[in-house]
Curated annotation (Swiss-Prot):
Protein origin, superkingdom: Eukaryota
Cofactor note: Binds 2 divalent metal cations per subunit. Has a high-affinity and a low affinity metal-binding site. The true nature of the physiological cofactor is under debate. The enzyme is active with cobalt, zinc, manganese or divalent iron ions. Most likely, methionine aminopeptidases function as mononuclear Fe(2+)-metalloproteases under physiological conditions, and the catalytically relevant metal-binding site has been assigned to the histidine-containing high-affinity site.
Cofactor(s) this protein requires: Co(2+); Zn(2+); Mn(2+); Fe(2+)
Protein name: Methionine aminopeptidase 2
Record-listed E.C. numbers: 3.4.11.18
Metal-binding in keyword set: yes
InterPro entries according to UniProt: Creatinase/aminopeptidase-like (IPR036005), Met_Aminopeptidase_Type2 (IPR050247), Pept_M24 (IPR000994), Pept_M24_MAP (IPR001714), Pept_M24A_MAP2 (IPR002468), Pept_M24A_MAP2_BS (IPR018349), WH-like_DNA-bd_sf (IPR036388), WH_DNA-bd_sf (IPR036390)
Reaction catalysis annotation: Release of N-terminal amino acids, preferentially methionine, from peptides and arylamides
Name of encoding gene: MAP2
Principal localisation: cytoplasm
UniProt function note: Cotranslationally removes the N-terminal methionine from nascent proteins. The N-terminal methionine is often cleaved when the second residue in the primary sequence is small and uncharged (Met-Ala-, Cys, Gly, Pro, Ser, Thr, or Val).
Species per Swiss-Prot/TrEMBL record: Clavispora lusitaniae (strain ATCC 42720) (Yeast)
PROSITE patterns in the record: MAP_2
Stretch list, region Disordered: 57-77
Any Gene Ontology biological process: proteolysis
């Protein structure tokens, strides 16, 4: 989920653009080798032609029967607690820290011991990440042009509920509203219940999915297109995100990550309908660190050089996300709001009405400080809540997050991973075979 930053515009760092760019995927992507299966043949028996034909016919009937049977045995999605009954979930991709001063961490027994003490904490993230991988695989297979945004959101969110095996949102489940931002809309759009938008073949959709287990949030996103003319835009953003992941680590300055991301992102161009566009970083969107039940926990990870000398620290969790655009490279809030979150410091704030009080109680009971959308309120049984909700926003009790948009007619893309800064190595916990 994107972190937006307000302030003065910054001139993009000038970088020579090239069409051939070193693929940073080689630093972090685990490529699975193709398996080769050797077959051995039994010595062929000599049979009469009529017997051979009869045996082939029998074999064919049996194969057809097996095929028919296998179609009926389609696997049904179940809670991962049944799949991983021992509570040990797949680890993410491990990476060394980039700085030489951190090289000792890999072999330091004390650091590894401290890491083991937080094993339950890490298992929550790994479970959330495995849910995320399965949900996005299903989404990538099933999302097609012609589907409504509501159908797509339901597909993703119901899959999260199935794989976590729990509809109690505070224990585990959806980490934040499913982002389905289209084209020039970069972030913070999910359909409200009256939404009629239909996905089109020419759309560029950012799919931003959050899964949490006991408040430990996995935040990861990809961009879905059906027309390959956008490939260079997607490649630029994906490689920029990989660069951010590679550069991140304990004691790394946030500015240095932003500078590296910008250099990669802005070395790309994309040709759309005969016109060439430079790919720009959206300079006021950032990655962020993640706290327990808090998606944006204070630090922001820039995607351009911005002079921030703040360092990443041991034990922190970060969402490394980058946004590229064919537009201005700067987003503004615009459009009907769907994303909200309860502010953490509301003790002593006078609530404006009895309806507002009951709505705050419902929000606390169902979401705590996790972000939510209007559809989730309705699922929790709330109706006729809009007036009270707007009162809470004006009172500063609830924060609203409207859609963030670049220039109309432009195209934006996003990729994102969650990383865990262990004492000895970093873990790209959301890494999968897809990205």
């Amino acid at each position: 989920m994107a972190s937006a930053q307000t302030g003065t515009e910054m001139s993009p760092h000038h970088v020579t653009r090239t069409y051939k760019h070193e693929n940073f995927l080689s630093f972090i992507s685990t490529m699975s080798e193709k398996e080769t299966v050797e077959t051995t043949q039994e010595p062929k028996q000599v049979v009469e032609p009529t017997q051979e034909l009869e045996e082939l016919a029998i074999d064919g009937d049996q194969a057809a029967a097996k095929k028919k049977k296998s179609k009926k045995k389609k696997k049904k999605a179940v809670s991962l607690d049944k799949t991983y009954a021992d509570g040990v979930f797949p680890e993410g991709q491990w990476m060394e820290y980039p700085l030489e001063v951190n090289s000792y961490r890999t072999t330091d027994e004390e650091k590894r011991y401290l890491d083991r003490q937080q094993n339950n904490h890490w298992q929550d993230f790994r479970k959330g990440a495995e849910v995320h991988r399965r949900v996005r695989q299903k989404a990538q297979q099933q999302i097609k042009p012609g589907m409504t945004m509501l159908e797509i959101a339901d597909l993703i969110e119901n899959s999260i509920r199935t794989y976590t095996g729990n509809d109690h949102t505070l224990k585990q489940g959806i980490g934040f509203p499913t982002g389905l931002s289209l084209n020039h809309v970069a972030a913070h759009y999910t359909p409200n219940s009256n939404d009629k938008v239909v996905l089109k073949y020419e759309d560029v959709m950012k799919v931003d999915i959050g899964v949490h287990v006991n408040g430990h949030i996995v935040d990861s996103a990809f961009t879905l297109t059906f027309d390959d003319k956008y490939d260079n835009l997607l490649t630029a953003v994906r490689e920029a995100t990989y660069t951010g992941v590679k550069e991140a680590g304990i004691d790394v300055r946030l500015n240095d990550i932003g500078a590296a991301v910008q250099e990669v992102m802005e070395s790309y161009e994309v040709e759309l309908d005969g016109k060439t566009y430079p790919v720009k970083c959206i300079r006021n969107l950032n990655g962020h660190n993640i706290g327990d039940y808090v998606i944006h926990s204070g630090k922001t990870v820039p995607i351009v050089a911005n002079g921030d000398m703040t360092k990443m620290e041991e034990g922190e969790t970060f969402a490394i996300e980058t946004f590229g655009t064919t537009g201005k490279g700067y987003v503004i809030p615009q459009g009907e709001c769907s994303h909200y979150a309860l502010n953490q410091d509301i003790d002593g704030v006078k609530l404006p009405s009895e309806r507002a009080k009951s709505l705050v109680k419902s929000i606390k009971d169902n979401f705590g400080t996790l972000p939510w959308c209007r559809r989730y309120l309705e699922r929790a049984g709330e109706d006729k809540y809009l007036l009270a909700l707007n009162q809470l926003v004006r009172a500063g009790v609830v924060e609203d997050y409207p859609p963030l948009v670049d220039t109309s007619g432009s195209y934006t893309a996003q990729y994102e991973h969650t990383i865990l800064l262990h004492p000895h190595k970093k873990e790209v916990v959301s890494k999968g075979d897809d990205y």
